[in-house]
């Protein structure tokens, strides 16, 4: 079940190349392609962030199983974390808007794409 409006254009939903997904606004590293997996929702899904501070989380009103997530560096809105809804028991599912991400292919990482 999803809590976001879907407007289409989710270019990273079926994107599985090796690399890093960074914040579209500031370039901070958010998710590795290793944590991305196929899910039935229309948004890209990840099981974990790259760094403990990659995202900031706040409760979603009236939905104890969902947290709103934003970039841990600049505050750019990213989507949601759904607790215990990942591919394995106990894992989360990060449901992220493609428009909030930029993809950096493996081997093309720079200090700018890492948010430094």
Curated annotation (Swiss-Prot):
Binding sites annotated in the UniProt record for Zn(2+): 23, 26, 71, 74
Active site per the UniProt annotation: 95 (nucleophile)
GO cellular component: actin cytoskeleton; cytosol; nucleus
Catalyzed reaction equations: L-methionyl-[protein] + [thioredoxin]-disulfide + H2O = L-methionyl-(R)-S-oxide-[protein] + [thioredoxin]-dithiol; [thioredoxin]-disulfide + L-methionine + H2O = L-methionine (R)-S-oxide + [thioredoxin]-dithiol
Record InterPro entries: Met_Sox_Rdtase_MsrB_dom (IPR002579), MsrB_Met_sulfoxide_reductase (IPR052150), Mss4-like_sf (IPR011057)
UniProt keywords, alphabetically: Cytoplasm, Cytoskeleton, Immunity, Innate immunity, Metal-binding, Nucleus, Oxidoreductase, Selenocysteine, Ubl conjugation, Zinc
The record's free-text note on cofactor binding: Binds 1 zinc ion per subunit.
Modified how: Truncated MSRB1/SEPX1 proteins produced by failed UGA/Sec decoding are ubiquitinated by some Cul2-RING E3 ubiquitin-protein ligase complexes (containing either PRAME, PRAMF6, PRAMF9 or FEM1C as substrate-recognition component).
EC number: 1.8.4.12, 1.8.4.14
Subcellular location: Cytoplasm; Nucleus; Cytoplasm, Cytoskeleton
PROSITE patterns documented for this protein: MSRB
One MF term in the entry's GO annotations: actin binding
Name of the top EC class for this enzyme: oxidoreductase
Cofactor: Zn(2+)
GO process annotations (BP): actin filament polymerization; innate immune response; protein repair
Domain MsrB: 1-106
One Pfam family it belongs to: SelR
Family: Belongs to the MsrB Met sulfoxide reductase family.
Role of this protein: Methionine-sulfoxide reductase that specifically reduces methionine (R)-sulfoxide back to methionine. While in many cases, methionine oxidation is the result of random oxidation following oxidative stress, methionine oxidation is also a post-translational modification that takes place on specific residue. Acts as a regulator of actin assembly by reducing methionine (R)-sulfoxide mediated by MICALs (MICAL1, MICAL2 or MICAL3) on actin, thereby promoting filament repolymerization. Plays a role in innate immunity by reducing oxidized actin, leading to actin repolymerization in macrophages.
Protein name: Methionine-R-sulfoxide reductase B1
Source species taxonomy: Eukaryota, Metazoa, Chordata, Craniata, Vertebrata
